[in-house]
Amino acid sequence: MSTKLFSYFMLLVVLFSVLTIIPKTEAQKRCRQELEPGKQCVLAKCRELCFKQLKGFGSCIEKPPGSSKYTCNCFYNCGPPGFF
């Protein structure tokens, strides 16, 4: 009986500690910046440039939509700094 009671108590403590931490966490904001506007995007170069400049992930996106022209867009973390 006492082992079962102790197990329930520990479960309650863990649950309570998780619930108190959850409101303190903040999702990091993601931003997008167009790199080399007007130039045709080459994916390998775009990813390298984005990582070097903003520590982000580069992607070629159609601009304007429906055309055959692509521009380099860099997606990176721009929100408040994390704890890690």
Swiss-Prot record:
Gene Ontology biological process: defense response to fungus; killing of cells of another organism
Q: Which residues form the signal peptide?
A: 1-27
Q: Does the keyword Ribosomal protein apply?
A: no
A GO cellular component annotation in the UniProt record: extracellular region
Q: Where in the cell is it found?
A: Secreted
- Superkingdom of this entry's organism? Eukaryota
Which keywords are on file for this protein? Antimicrobial, Disulfide bond, Fungicide, Plant defense, Secreted, Signal
Q: List the disulfide bonds.
A: 31-78, 41-60, 46-72, 50-74
Keyword Manganese found: no
The family annotation for this protein states: Belongs to the DEFL family.
Q: What is this protein called?
A: Putative defensin-like protein 165
Per the UniProt record, the source organism is: Arabidopsis thaliana (Mouse-ear cress)
Taxonomic classification:
Eukaryota, Viridiplantae, Streptophyta, Embryophyta, Tracheophyta
Name of the gene encoding the protein in the UniProt record? LCR12
